[in-house]
Amino acid sequence: MNATQTQPQNADQQSVAATAKEQGTEARDRQPPLHPETPAPSNTPRKDSLNQFASWLRQDARAEATTYLHRANTHHDGE
């Protein structure tokens, strides 16, 4: 064994093995519910983010239209 490897203590190994065995037995003995309840879909965060995105698009489109109209009204090619 080199200096970087460590050897676990025997007592720790036994307690970890016993805990794992107990947890495995509990999980095996537990029965799944006959009719599991499905969680209610939560559309609120998604809806809010879509509304925010739509609002941002409207603001951006409004700013672009304002800039376009200003340039069209103030810059006349050849006149």
Swiss-Prot record:
It comes from the Bacteria. The keyword Amino-acid biosynthesis does not apply. Residues 1-50 are annotated as: Disordered. Signal peptide: none annotated. GO terms for molecular function: protein tag activity. The keyword Cytoplasm does not apply. InterPro entries: UBact. Keywords: Isopeptide bond, Ubl conjugation pathway. Residues 1-17, 40-50 have a biased composition (Polar residues). Residues 23-32 have a biased composition (Basic and acidic residues). There is a cross-link at E79 (Isoglutamyl lysine isopeptide (Glu-Lys) (interchain with K-? in acceptor proteins)). HAMAP family: UBact (MF_02133). May function as a protein modifier covalently attached to lysine residues of substrate proteins. As this bacterium does not seem to encode proteasome subunits and proteasome ATPase adjacently to UBact, this tagging system may serve another role than targeting the modified proteins for degradation by proteasomes. Belongs to the ubiquitin-like protein UBact family. This is Prokaryotic ubiquitin-like protein UBact. The gene is ubact.
